[in-house]
């Protein structure tokens, strides 16, 4: 669904990504793993248009969207959820969900909110609370619920389980699977919890120093020597 | 004395409420730190002194020097107004229309240089632009008479002097009420919610498909158009304009204090903030020398109002940053209907 070709990107004059080639398949979960500072989050930000692209192409539905600004990418049904700052803290949960629907037809918004609440029933009891008062898990539910309200086709998640307990992280992973299976979402996932993320994924990429060090199916990546070294914190010389 | 005091409080409440409501939309709702708010008020003065006065010169066939010419023109129109009150009301409406249009355009242009700026950088850029325009208007005699100033029509030339303050205060209050209704109607909508969202998190607003710059332009254009109305009213009240009357202290910083005091993102809260501050400030200005002698204050009491400003700002930001009346969720008409249904059951 999204093809990345020879992508070079960074922040201002600081280049982070070097000659990245990748393919995110429609209706699949693709996980990006790698050590801190490897460019995983920058990769997501670049796809969404929040970094400076020096060269390369991002092909989505047969069009190069590398130079398309974020708000137009959003209207192309691409949703990006940063690790933090992904909700409006001073607005209520209900208001957050409504705002997510502002690019849709009025009739459709109500329907989409009901769908979001069916996937995240935990939100029903807290609709009147300010988003800033939610726990970490509730906040992630809200952020992902907002993506569902928008009727997104591609969902890019940047470490959605960061700072959550293992039990809650597992719930998040289950929701991600549910969104892929029930709504056919294409999901691109950046996770520090690499092993578990790959276990729920279809495909995987390993980034090292801003380059793709390995790509393949999630299973292949799980069994790769490089990944084992990375998981154990061993650096081969 | 007390009667005049009340009319003065009402007048300043009305003027500052108009400015503060528009600042509340820009800063309280949209999160735009418009430290150049004084510019929109100055634009109202320019509409009256720079455009309306020229139209009057044209109408009465008066040529020659701008400053002198407008003196003759305003004398002529005042004579006309004295015998035809309708003309005065017409001048007021014309001035408001001119100012709103000019304010709208200037507001839209004013925000453009800051396309990539945020927060402090955005605020300081707007302040700098505002100051630059004020300096130009102060030293260029052909805009609003520079440091000499310029005459403006007395739209209440048909009212005797002793009642003029009262009548003008009620006109200002009426217009302030209309502005309040306008903002309540404009901001209790999905648009208002998007502005609040933009204040919270611009990247997430982009992520939901909205163009931040368009929202800023729209917000600043509307905010400046309304701010310019206050400039018109002030210029017509004083029946003259001098550029130095439109300083950042009076028309940017005081409104910020009033918005924060009353409660940003909340139009009723702003009313309370404006009322509290205006009462204290007017009383302080009038009785500052009585206070000096009563308390044995060892310095010039003219500084008391600035000290009050500083102390209040620190107290608000430290102890109650949400203001006297904190903001509430935006209730759009459909939500209101739903609430009525639920409570009706």
Swiss-Prot record, chain A:
Keywords per UniProt: Amino-acid transport, ATP-binding, Nucleotide-binding, Transport
Stored InterPro entries: AAA+_ATPase, ABC_transporter-like_ATP-bd, BCAA_Transport_ATP-bd_LivF, P-loop_NTPase
Gene Ontology molecular function: ATP binding; ATP hydrolysis activity
Residue ranges annotated for the ABC transporter domain, each copy included: 2-234
Annotated residues for binding of ATP: 34-41
Source superkingdom: Archaea
Keyword hit for Nucleotide-binding: yes
SMART domains given in the database record: AAA
GO biological process: branched-chain amino acid transport; L-amino acid transport
CDD domains: ABC_TM1139_LivF_branched
Function according to Swiss-Prot or TrEMBL: Probable component of a branched-chain amino-acid transport system.
Family affiliation: Belongs to the ABC transporter superfamily.
Protein's UniProt name: Probable branched-chain amino acid transport ATP-binding protein LivF
Curated annotation (Swiss-Prot), chain B:
Keyword Nucleotide-binding carried by entry: no
Physiological role: Part of the binding-protein-dependent transport system for branched-chain amino acids. Probably responsible for the translocation of the substrates across the membrane.
Subcellular localization(s) per the UniProt record: Cell membrane
GO cellular component, one term: plasma membrane
Molecular-function annotations in GO: branched-chain amino acid transmembrane transporter activity
Protein name as it appears in the record: Probable branched-chain amino acid transport permease protein LivM
ATP-binding in keyword set: no
Entry keywords, A to Z: Amino-acid transport, Cell membrane, Membrane, Transmembrane, Transmembrane helix, Transport
Gene: livM
Major localization listed first in the record, in broad terms: membrane
Species whose genome carries this gene: Methanocaldococcus jannaschii (strain ATCC 43067 / DSM 2661 / JAL-1 / JCM 10045 / NBRC 100440)
InterPro entries in UniProt: ABC_transp_permease, LivM-like
GO process terms (BP): amino acid transport
Annotated family: Belongs to the binding-protein-dependent transport system permease family. LivHM subfamily.
Transmembrane regions: 3-23, 42-62, 91-111, 124-144, 163-183, 222-242, 269-289, 297-317
Membrane topology summary: Multi-pass membrane protein
